[in-house]
Amino acid sequence: MLISTVMTTRRDALAAALALLTEAAASAQAQKGADPSTVFVHDLPNLTMDDWQVTVSHVPYAPGRVGQTHHHAGFVLAYVLEGAVVTKISGQAERVYKTGEMFYEAPGATHEVSKNASSTEPAKLLALIFARKGDTLTTPGPATSAH
């Protein structure tokens, strides 16, 4: 699986990442001929962001692709660019997210299910992973301790 990644360490990384997501959401809305609207609202962890960075990854899902159980050191904002993705994060119900929808993963939460909802169409996800500099971003398997 190919994942393209861009990293930044500037203090305005959060603002830049949210601007990127806003642009992606606005583009998806414009293609549908609708007015811009709120796509996602979620409280973020109480943290300072000093010595943190954001990593933006493009995650393609081939038809029928099933990802492995994993967790992240930091928190994740994920935006579905194309298709539909089935996800289940520890403590939550399994859910299908379609083009233009987003979800949040708390630091250390286990991503139990991550798969393409279609066996015939591809899906694409844009993942913004916010973590401390030097942390391993994605670790296979369930989290063994709370972060």
Task: Describe each model-derived feature in a short phrase.
Residues 74-91, 101:
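Glycine- and acidic-residue-biased ligand/ion/polar-headgroup-sensing regions
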Residues 2-21:
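N-terminal secretory signal peptides and thylakoid transit peptides that target proteins
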Residues 26-30:
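Boundary at the C-terminal end of the N-terminal hydrophobic targeting segment
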Residues 66-68, 86, 103, 107-116:
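Histidine-centered metal-chelating micro-motifs
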Residues 34-68:
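A short glycine-rich, His/Asp/Glu-containing loop-to-beta-strand
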Residues 91-108:
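Short acidic-glycine-tyrosine-enriched beta hairpin
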Residues 108-135:
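Ligand-binding loop in jelly-roll beta-barrel domains
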